[in-house]
Amino acid sequence: MFEFYIAAREQKETGHPGIFSRQKHSTIIYVICLLLICLWFAGMVLVGGYARQLWVLWIVKAEVTVEAETPAFKQSTQHYFFKKQPLPVVESVEEEDDPGVAVENAPSSSEDEENTVEESEEKAGLRERVKNALNELER
């Protein structure tokens, strides 16, 4: 700031205009260079930001979707807690020995009989799983 005053005083004393004009031009060049550097920096920040967004949207998202589409193993909802163990063997549940009760409780058709057998096997399997889970929790 004081350089201009000093240069103006020297110009008045010597009558030589070259020093003042040279300093004026050098400050304009400095300002232009500073503006160019600021514009370059802002451009790099913008380009980097857009490049990162494109990377996240196209490349990373594509990698995640490929992994999600092809699982390494088949997921089973049948036996969630016992994936590493085989399913327990289902033991048949014996009915009461009284024939009168057995006749009253007999299913009306073969389809009902198949359904009740499947349901009893499922219940026995579920009971077995619950017992195994409780035993594992106690250990």
Swiss-Prot record:
Keywords in alphabetical order: Cell membrane, Membrane, Transmembrane, Transmembrane helix
UniProt-annotated location(s): Cell membrane
Domain of life: Bacteria
Induction per the UniProt record: Silenced by the DNA-binding protein H-NS under standard growth conditions.
GO cellular component, one term: plasma membrane
Positions with biased composition (Basic and acidic residues): 122-139
Record field: transmembrane: 28-48
Keyword Zinc listed: no
Acidic residues bias locations: 110-121
Chain intervals for the UniProt region annotation (Disordered): 93-139
Membrane topology designation: Single-pass membrane protein
Primary localisation category: membrane
Function: Part of a cryptic operon that encodes proteins involved in type II secretion pathway in other organisms, but is not expressed in strain K12 under standard laboratory conditions. May play a regulatory role under conditions of derepressed gsp gene expression.
Protein name as catalogued: Putative general secretion pathway protein B
